[in-house]
A protein has these predicted regions:
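Charged helix-capping and loop-helix junction motifs
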Residues: 102-110, 142-149
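A short helix->loop->beta-strand "cap" motif at the edges of active sites that frequently abuts
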Residues: 118-123, 161
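Conserved catalytic region of serine esterases and O-acyltransferases that act on ester linkages
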Residues: 6-8, 158, 181-184, 188-316
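Serine-esterase "nucleophile elbow" of acetyl-processing enzymes
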Residues: 1-63, 75-82, 280, 286-288, ...
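Oxyanion-hole/transition-state-stabilizing segment in secreted/luminal serine hydrolases
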Residues: 21-25, 51-53, 67-104, 130-131
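Short glycine-enriched, charge-decorated loop/helix-capping segments at active-site entrances
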Residues: 26-32, 100-103, 138-142, 179-180
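Substrate-gating cap/lid alpha-helix
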Residues: 133-167, 187
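Short hydrophobic segments within beta-strands
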Residues: 15-16, 126, 216
Length: 316
């Protein structure tokens, strides 16, 4: 990422929605807060050649926030603090809505990105998950997310941002990387995304291969029961909140509103030890799984695995 030590990342601010707040990392803190990939990335950067042992970290991401709210509430914080790095992953809650103007979202994003880049802030973007890995009910969102992602790549190239390609990280589609709601990452998923983000910032490239989703082996009856349970426990409450005009994060404050030393972040023991499983190892495992399937048999899985995400890609 940098050529000189003076350009190392010494301050990092995460903004966005539930993804960057850290839901549903099972390694929750005692006060109920989640750890998440941005906490893990901040800690990892204290031991990275592009980071600093004394790196300071703040997190203003709040669950349920749509893009307009993030731009109105969180981007001004970034412009005020002027951190070395901002991770800005947003728009997922907007794209889920039928009336969304995807081109309009891109225009909003560009204004926010331009403002931060004009202040010399490095920006790490993340694109949308492949919703074909969601429930069949949400598979129809895939074209909309794909258009949004195309805009994201354009913005990254246009403004010199780093891109965390969450769409293309096919190893992340495995069920163990997702929470039961099929929308948020598990602890393993957050670890993998943090590792990939670090790889991007360090200027390395990991060859995540493949395009198809892993074929499910569950019987049809089990898949139908799993779908019904998900609709009742997760989708119905979400729709109810939308109809009432409420948000799960309506009354929440930022997790880390002020700077905290990233080296002292409370992470679980496996995270403290560093990269326990490399992105390349994840890809190798995915290749082994794919080798057992005949070409062309891959299809959408039905386990708790939301839109897949993609691994690192170089800065554009």
């Amino acid at each position: 990422m940098t050529e000189h030590e003076d350009n190392r990342i010494r301050t990092y601010l995460a903004i966005g929605d539930s993804f960057s707040e850290g839901l549903m990392d099972e390694s929750a803190l005692e006060d109920g807060r989640f750890i998440g990939w941005t906490d893990r990335l901040a800690h990892a950067l204290t031991q990275s050649p592009v980071g600093s042992p004394n790196l300071l970290y703040a997190n203003h991401a709040i669950r349920g926030r749509q893009l307009t709210a993030i731009i109105d509430e969180q981007v001004p914080v970034a412009l005020d603090l002027k951190p070395d790095l901002v991770s800005f992953v947003a728009g997922g809650n907007d794209v889920l809505r039928p009336s969304v103007d995807v081109d309009g979202l891109a225009e909003q994003l560009e204004r926010a990105i331009s403002a931060m880049r004009a202040e010399g802030i490095e920006v790490l973007l993340g694109n949308g998950f492949d919703t074909a890995a969601f429930s069949p009910m949400l598979r129809a969102l895939r074209p909309r997310v794909a258009v949004y992602n195309a805009h994201m790549w354009t913005l990254a190239g246009r403004h010199g941002c780093y891109m965390l390609d969450l769409w293309g990280m096919r190893p992340l589609y495995a069920p163990e990387y997702w929470a039961p709601d099929r929308i948020h990452l598990s602890t393993q998923g957050h670890r993998m995304v943090a590792q990939s983000a670090q790889t991007v910032l360090e200027g390395s490239r990991v060859d995540f291969r493949g395009f198809r989703l892993q074929k499910t082996s569950k019987p049809l009856r089990d898949r139908m029961e799993n779908e019904a349970e998900w609709l009742k426990d997760h989708l119905a409450p979400w729709v109810g909140r939308r109809l009432r005009g409420t948000s799960s994060g309506a009354f929440l404050d930022p997790k880390y509103a002020e700077w905290v030393p990233a080296a002292e972040l409370p992470l679980d023991a496996r995270s403290q030890s560093g990269r326990n499983v490399s992105p390349a190892a994840h890809q190798a495992a995915a290749d082994d799984a794919a080798a057992s399937e005949a070409p062309g048999t891959s299809e959408v899985p039905d386990a708790p695995e939301p839109p897949g995400t993609s691994g690192p890609s170089d800065r554009t």
